[in-house]
Structures are given as C-alpha cells and as structure tokens.
C-alpha cells in the first residue's frame, strides 16, 4: 500500500507543478479544487486545522478573482504531504477509493494536466 500511496502523491504533485508552470490554473479551476479537497478530506476524516486553512485560502482566492499563487500551491502540496494521516487512511479501501475519485474529478475539470 505504501507504493500506491507514493504513486498517487507523485501523480498529484507532478500535474499540479505542470499546471502552475504553464499558468493554466485559474480562479474557476480553484473552485473545483476547493470543493473536491473539502469533500475528499471530509470523507476520509481529515478534520484538521490544515484542511480548514486550505479551504479558507481557496475561498479567498475565489473572492479575489485572481490566479492561484505560490501560497496556494504550498497549501496544495502540504495537503498531499500529510503522510501520517494519509498513510492511515490508505489502509482502508473505501477511503483509498475516495482519494482516487478526487484525483480523477480534478483531472476531468482540467486542474490536473
């Protein structure tokens, strides 16, 4: 299961980096990310201050109607680096499925390239 977790994190991070480098992450796409991150973290029980900080920052980004900057990118990467929480979540198949569903939802909305 550790290999699956590592592969999943790499997929997320590589695609986020590509999107940021090419300037393709827009405010509209941040709404999609905000909703999916909030729902997914709720499903797998990641009720933490970091989740709330990430969600609040996405909401702020939407209100300001500007492109996602470095701060939001840091928060995106930190969410997928909550190793202790994700590692325990990935021991359960339904929670693993929730994470993968979020990944495909983000890819479908073209947040992930």
Curated annotation (Swiss-Prot):
Biological source species: Saccharomyces cerevisiae (strain ATCC 204508 / S288c) (Baker's yeast)
Domain of life: Eukaryota
Protein name: Uncharacterized protein YIL012W
